[in-house]
Amino acid sequence: MAKAKFERSKPHVNIGTIGHVDHGKTTLTAAITTVLAQKGGASATKYDEIDKAPEEKERGITINTSHVEYETANRHYAHVDCPGHADYVKNMITGAAQMDGAILVVSAADGPMPQTREHILLASRVGVQYIVVFLNKADQVDDPELIELVEMEVRELLNEYGFPGDDTPIVVGSALEVLENQDNAEKTKCIDELMEAIDSYIPTPERATDQPFLMPVEDVFTITGRGTVATGRVERGVLHTGDEVELIGMKQEVSKTVCTGIEMFRKILDEAMAGDNIGALLRGIQRDEIQRGQVLAKPGSVTPHKKFVGQVYVLKKEEGGRHTPFFNGYRPQFYFRTTDVTGSINLPEGVEMVMPGDHIDMAVELITPVAMHENLRFAIREGGRTVGSGVVTTISE
């Protein structure tokens, strides 16, 4: 068969498998690629190839993740699977592999377990809004009522963490049976059902270019006779020459200006879009009124804040993190986008200290405001070395 050309015509969605250890996340990943390979939508990836996930470094944290890709009739998917529980925690908090939706794998024989709960909680904290459930190992359960019971438990658990449990698609099957009976349409039907549920239930994410414009300021310089230029990489949205923008962060007040010119690689552009590295010429802004760490953004789209609650993973000693615990009132630097800001932390009630390797919710108060929104990632640093990684879960003020 001639190789098909990769078509960009299909919308792209990032998903991943989550759930308790040994409930069959990796087996399911292998089963999906195997079934879709027969339709020409993937190359079959064996369990062992997925399980020996390569180590990746994301912000200095070692995470094992496996990436596979496949497509259905409607979409192209990038799918991430992590071998160990700690890898999931790190992956979800650092956003190393962004997930637009997740497949929660629960063993029908065992029902929800501690990590099932923990992964649902993490998904809700880090902004994974859509979950589709696969009840695996159904071949090990003789009584259909038991499967219904597990289904009810899973729906209740999803409701508990703010997901619409009653409306969540749940597909029942056995990933191992699929792998052992690849040519038996009856046995592989559960994968077709799962992919249909994912196609219809997890919406196509809004592309970065459709979101409101935002660019973190990396550097500032003056062009004699023309004015002040801010450089940086456009994080989201589109900027046109003549657009009004706000300058936000590092001080309480927000200043407004107009972008009078855009340059990229010394060429003049009419518009810049997400992903472009640009210089933006700003009308009426003095060199000392703008600094690294601020952002340029569409007016009204983002606001500066000092207080927030974050979900944080604290690096282990082996990952280059601290060797000792920290306590209430700890004052490290919080690195948002392009700059460090000092902040003090408040631990949850009943938590005396935080050990390297822990993940925890903490309340933070920064000394200067930063342009922030929920789900924004940050690093915690001490003297320039990363000791933690986090995501903003709620903004306090």
Curated annotation (Swiss-Prot):
Region described as G1: 19-26
One GO BP annotation of this record: sulfur compound metabolic process
Region span, G2: 60-64
Signal peptide feature range: none
The encoding gene: tuf1
Residues at which GTP binds: 19-26, 81-85, 136-139
Protein name: Elongation factor Tu
EC nos: 3.6.5.3
tr-type G domain segment(s): 10-206
Database matches in InterPro entries: EF-Tu_GTP-bd, EF-Tu_GTPase, EFTu-like_2, EFTU_2, G_TR_CS, P-loop_NTPase, Small_GTP-bd, T_Tr_GTP-bd_dom
Start and end residues of each stretch annotated as G5: 174-176
Function statement: GTP hydrolase that promotes the GTP-dependent binding of aminoacyl-tRNA to the A-site of ribosomes during protein biosynthesis.
GO cellular component entries: cytoplasm
Family: Belongs to the TRAFAC class translation factor GTPase superfamily. Classic translation factor GTPase family. EF-Tu/EF-1A subfamily.
Database matches in NCBIfam families: EF-Tu (TIGR00485), PRK00049.1 (NF000766), PRK12735.1 (NF009372), PRK12736.1 (NF009373), small_GTP (TIGR00231)
Name of a matching Pfam family: GTP_EFTU_D2
HAMAP family found in the cross-reference section: EF_Tu_B (MF_00118_B)
Reactions this protein catalyses: GTP + H2O = GDP + phosphate + H(+)
Region (G4): 136-139
Native source species: Clostridium botulinum (strain Hall / ATCC 3502 / NCTC 13319 / Type A)
Keywords, comma-separated and alphabetical: Cytoplasm, Elongation factor, GTP-binding, Hydrolase, Magnesium, Metal-binding, Nucleotide-binding, Protein biosynthesis
Region listing for G3, in residue ranges: 81-84
Major subcellular site: cytoplasm
UniProt-annotated location(s): Cytoplasm
Keyword Ligase: no
Oligomeric and partner information: Monomer.
Amino-acid positions noted as binding Mg(2+) in the UniProt annotation, renumbered to this chain: T26
GO molecular function ontology, one term from the record: translation elongation factor activity
